Amino acid sequence: MSQEAILEKVRSIVAEQLSVDAGEVKPESNFQNDLGADSLDTVELVMALEEAFDIEIPDESAEGILTVGDAVKYIEDKQA
């Protein structure tokens, strides 16, 4: 899956999970600061990404995923 395809899928999931417009979801968007996620939202978002991409994101890794771009990079690395 290309980086662009991953970004589009992540953007769609983030928009749905956080009830924000997909146009607001950019690679540099911080889940908490820019998109208004709280800690529970972040946990639910990680679970949604795990399911959508059929990967596991350990808690230690999830703590380092702060932006949409971080999520895309992590998923891209896992699928390589």
Swiss-Prot record:
4'-phosphopantetheine is transferred from CoA to a specific serine of apo-ACP by AcpS. This modification is essential for activity because fatty acids are bound in thioester linkage to the sulfhydryl of the prosthetic group. PANTHER family: ACYL CARRIER PROTEIN, CARRIER DOMAIN-CONTAINING PROTEIN. SUPFAM superfamilies: ACP-like (SSF47336). The lineage of its organism: Bacteria, Bacillati, Cyanobacteriota, Cyanophyceae, Synechococcales. NCBIfam families: acyl_carrier, PRK00982.1-2, PRK00982.1-3, PRK00982.1-4, PRK00982.1-5. It is found in: Cytoplasm. Residues 4-79 form the Carrier domain. The gene is acpP. GO terms for biological process: lipid A biosynthetic process. Pathway: Lipid metabolism; fatty acid biosynthesis. GO terms for cellular component: cytosol; membrane. Carrier of the growing fatty acid chain in fatty acid biosynthesis. The modification O-(pantetheine 4'-phosphoryl)serine is found at S39. Keywords: Cytoplasm, Fatty acid biosynthesis, Fatty acid metabolism, Lipid biosynthesis, Lipid metabolism, Phosphopantetheine, Phosphoprotein. One of its GO terms (molecular function) is acyl binding. This is Acyl carrier protein. Gene3D superfamilies: ACP-like (1.10.1200.10). Belongs to the acyl carrier protein (ACP) family. Pfam families: PP-binding.
